[in-house]
Amino acid sequence: MTIPRIPRQLYGIIGYPLGHSMSPLLHNWGFELLGEQAAYMAFPVAPEKLAEFICCARMLPVSGLSVTIPHKQAVMPLLDAVTPRAQAAGAVNTLFYDDGKLTGDNTDVYGFLHPLDSCGTAHAAALVLGAGGAANAVLAALTARGMCNVTVTNRNGDRARILAERFGVRCVAWEERHAVDADLVVNTTPLGMAGDRQAQTPLDPAFFSSRPAGLAYDLIYNPAQTFFLASAQAAGWRVLNGLDMFVAQGAEQFRIWRGRELPFAQARALIADALASGC
C-alpha cells in the first residue's frame, strides 16, 4: 500500500497514546482502493495540547479527524457545532467541516450496534463498565433501542453517576459491580488493551460462571481476545470483540468525509489480518 506523495486532502486521528490504532491502515487502504487523493496520519496529542492542536488544525489543510481516548468529550467545547447524534451520545469521535464549521459527529453508536444487531437476540439487562466517551455512545445506543434495565459502573463514581443521570439508567459503585444481574456486559474501559494493561480485566471470571450465559462485548479489538472475553467464553457466554465496531465506525467516518462506502468484509479482513500478524 502506498500513500500519495502530495495528497489533496489530509485526515488523521488524535488521541494519546496512539500506538494501538489501526485507523491509519483502514483509511489509507480505503483511499487507495477507491482512488482518492488523500492521506491519513496519526497525531499523538497529549490532553494539555488538545486546544492548541485544534487551533492549528483549523489553519492547516486538514479535512477531517478521528478522535479517540482521551479526547472524545474534551474536544466538544473546541468545536463550532456538533451533530444531533453526537449531542445525544455526549461524545465526539469524528470531526469534519460542514459549510466551513468544524463539526463533531459520533459514529461509535452506529459502530456499536452493527455487530450487536447481527447477533439477533434481545437482552433483558445490561451492565456497562466504564464512563468515558465510548460508554456514552454505548448508553446512547442501548437507551435508543428501548432497553430499560441498564446499569453503569466506573472506578470514578462521580463520572458514573453523571452518566447514569444523563441517560436515566442505574449506577452502582465499582466495588458492587459483580452483584449486578445482566445478560449483556459491555467493557468500555481500556483494561485488557494491548500494552501495559493487556493482563488486566474489569470483571472477575467468577462473574460469568455464577449466572446464566449471555453476551460479553469488549470494545477492545487489540488483542482480539482479552482476558475479559476469555473468561466469559470459558463460562459458556457468547463473545464479541471490538473489531466489527471499529470497522463499522471507521467506514461511517469514511462515508462522512468522502461520501463513499468502504466494502465492509474487505475492510474487516484487512484489519483482522494486520492484528493477527502483529502489525
Curated annotation (Swiss-Prot):
Matching Gene3D superfamilies: Leucine Dehydrogenase, chain A, domain 1, NAD(P)-binding Rossmann-like Domain
The transmembrane segments are: none
Which amino acids does the record list as binding NADP(+)?
A: G130, A131, G132, G133, A134, L219, G242
Q: Which GO terms describe its molecular function?
A: NADP binding; shikimate 3-dehydrogenase (NADP+) activity
Q: Which cysteines are joined by disulfide bonds?
A: none
Signal sequence interval, chain numbering: none
- Entry's EC annotation: 1.1.1.25
* One GO term (biological process): shikimate metabolic process
Catalytic activity reported: shikimate + NADP(+) = 3-dehydroshikimate + NADPH + H(+)
Keyword Plastid among record annotations: no
Pfam entry (one): Shikimate_dh_N
Active site positions: K72
First-level EC class: oxidoreductase
Q: What keywords appear on the UniProt entry?
A: Amino-acid biosynthesis, Aromatic amino acid biosynthesis, NADP, Oxidoreductase
| Positions with a binding annotation for shikimate | S21, M22, S23, T68, N93, D108, Y221
Q: Which GO terms describe its cellular component?
A: cytosol
Instruction: Show the SUPFAM superfamilies listed in the entry.
Output: Aminoacid dehydrogenase-like, N-terminal domain (SSF53223), NAD(P)-binding Rossmann-fold domains (SSF51735)
Query: In which pathway is this protein known to take part?
Result: Metabolic intermediate biosynthesis; chorismate biosynthesis; chorismate from D-erythrose 4-phosphate and phosphoenolpyruvate: step 4/7
User: What is known about what this protein does?
Assistant: Involved in the biosynthesis of the chorismate, which leads to the biosynthesis of aromatic amino acids. Catalyzes the reversible NADPH linked reduction of 3-dehydroshikimate (DHSA) to yield shikimate (SA).
What does the sequence similarity comment in the record state about its family?
Belongs to the shikimate dehydrogenase family.
Assembly and partners are described as: Homodimer.
By its UniProt entry, which PANTHER family does this protein fall under? BIFUNCTIONAL 3-DEHYDROQUINATE DEHYDRATASE_SHIKIMATE DEHYDROGENASE, CHLOROPLASTIC, SHIKIMATE DEHYDROGENASE
Name of protein: Shikimate dehydrogenase (NADP(+))
